[in-house]
Amino acid sequence: MAFVPAPGYQPTYNPTLPYHNPIPGGLRVGMSVYIQGVASEHMKRFFVNFEVGQGQGADVAFHFNPRFDGWDKVVLNSKQNGSWGQEERKMSMPFRKGAAFELVFMVMTEHFKVVVNGTPFHEFKHRIPLQMVTHLHVDGDLMLQSINFIGGQPPSNQMPMPAQAYPMPMSAQAYPSPGQYYQQQSRLPTMEGPPAFNPPVPFNGRLQGGLIVRRTIIIKGYIPPTAKSFVINFKVGSSGDVALHINPRMTEGAVVRNSFLNGSWGSEERKVSYNPFGPGQFFDLSVRCGADRFKVYANGKHLFDFSHRLSAFQRVDLVEIHGDVTLSYVQI
């Protein structure tokens, strides 16, 4: 079954190189571009360009260019009217050969903010007006796993997503069990509430208005190499009931799902066609709520369905995440 992204969330999975495509809705303040991939074992260099047009001699508003050449560094620049500008160089290398990475470009009013694996790396001041940027160009010694444009093409009834972290309301209780909430789309999925960038774990987010049909939750994160397990709960705060509990267990290679209703656990479900939660891996989860089930997608592929066991699933008002995981983005 096909993955359908929510408005304002434009992912491409396993794109081929060179990647040279339009930016959905154009570039503007408040957008973030997430690039997940793996650096080649024999990596010498790769680049990410924010370009004005798609022609061979297109201007480049921002050129991001890691180079392994004996003097490991990252070169940052722009190109206007066929000429490169003044280079900015960072004599540090945040990428490792053969290692997975997450590279985030946050579009701010005055600059691009670059974050690598959750750590701020550099701020590059705008030299070309943002509204002129139309295409993203990626190529070099890497393998791309996903490119996500977040905050692009917002629906008319939503404000653009801010590019800064917003603290999420904390619940008074923490339910010590795993669970993830996914939503089924029957028409157009919706997302509500401000996004959280690099939120701390444990994460407690309140679902304003409760869990409704066609609501979509996005969770992006990283599994540390020594991780054993983590938990995502979709919970009713007033009762402690958990409509969907997702528990990736790296030590078992399992993705356990369950519910906790009226003080008792239900029967576990474990069957999946593949497991995206490997140590040292990034993941991108999309949870959709349907009228009769949750649908869970990972990295753009259907992972599992979970039929509603809590008939009044609309009472779910909390999303809890805890355990051995690093979060880079949560949209609830």
Curated annotation (Swiss-Prot):
<feature type="domain" description="Galectin 2">
    <location>
        <begin position="203"/>
        <end position="332"/>
    </location>
</feature>
<feature type="binding site">
    <location>
        <begin position="265"/>
        <end position="271"/>
    </location>
    <ligand>
        <name>a beta-D-galactoside</name>
    </ligand>
</feature>
<keyword id="KW-0677">Repeat</keyword>
<dbReference type="GO" id="GO:0030246">
    <property type="term" value="F:carbohydrate binding"/>
</dbReference>
<dbReference type="InterPro" id="IPR013320">
    <property type="entry name" value="ConA-like_dom_sf"/>
</dbReference>
<dbReference type="Pfam" id="PF00337">
    <property type="entry name" value="Gal-bind_lectin"/>
</dbReference>
<feature type="modified residue" description="Phosphoserine">
    <location>
        <position position="267"/>
    </location>
</feature>
<comment type="subunit">
    <text>Monomer.</text>
</comment>
<keyword id="KW-0430">Lectin</keyword>
<dbReference type="InterPro" id="IPR001079">
    <property type="entry name" value="Galectin_CRD"/>
</dbReference>
<protein>
    <recommendedName>
        <fullName>Galectin-4</fullName>
    </recommendedName>
</protein>
<keyword id="KW-0597">Phosphoprotein</keyword>
<comment type="function">
    <text>Galectin that binds lactose and a related range of sugars. May be involved in the assembly of adherens junctions.</text>
</comment>
<feature type="domain" description="Galectin 1">
    <location>
        <begin position="19"/>
        <end position="150"/>
    </location>
</feature>
<dbReference type="InterPro" id="IPR044156">
    <property type="entry name" value="Galectin-like"/>
</dbReference>
